[in-house]
Amino acid sequence: MRSAALAAVAVAAFAMIGCGSQNPGQPAGSASGTPESTAPPAKPASMNEYLHSVGVTVTPVSPESPANVRVDVPLPRGWENLGALDPAYLIADKPSDADQGRTPSAVVYLIKLGGPLDARKVISEHGFADAQNTQNFRKIASSLDDYQGYPSAAIEGTYENQGVRVHAWSRDVIVPDGPLHYLVQFTVTTTEAQSAALSQDVAALTGGLKITKR
């Protein structure tokens, strides 16, 4: 069942934020004829790892919760709203454009953060890490421009997932709410092969993300 499969992906993504690897370029070789043993480069700390390391509590929020922050994403034609599949706030997909056993998908998480934090520091230092830590990630574009007046990191790229090259666009936004903060995580995913054909859909989704406070 399609919704069950996407729900499983949502749970895995939330539980495994930051898994994967990044392979930056190697430095120029030395003149020595003896090969040197080098440790693999350290992965950047994911958003989730960093928040836990500084004692910030992380609680997924559903649309039915009394949270003061709401997230809306208008869906292009052919996309279906599958609702809030815990822990995701919203999951949508386009079943008519399945490719290599996958449907294009859009996933939103709304996460309540408890504890003091510097939102701009978190975004600037860890906003790209979840994407960078995916398998064989290749960046296409990124931005640290604010979104709707809030600290934000957006990144687009491709990575390998179970033998399929995936094209993903992601945005993290941290919204202050008194002593609390809310983290909005939004990802739109297609296969690399269909990314050009679905570029208008992706643009409508990513440009339509709306964050409101009560």
Predicted regions and their residues:
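N-terminal targeting sequences that direct proteins away from the cytosol to non-cytosolic compartments
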Residues: 1-90, 189-214
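Signature of long, low-cysteine stretches enriched in small and polar/charged residues
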Residues: 124-174
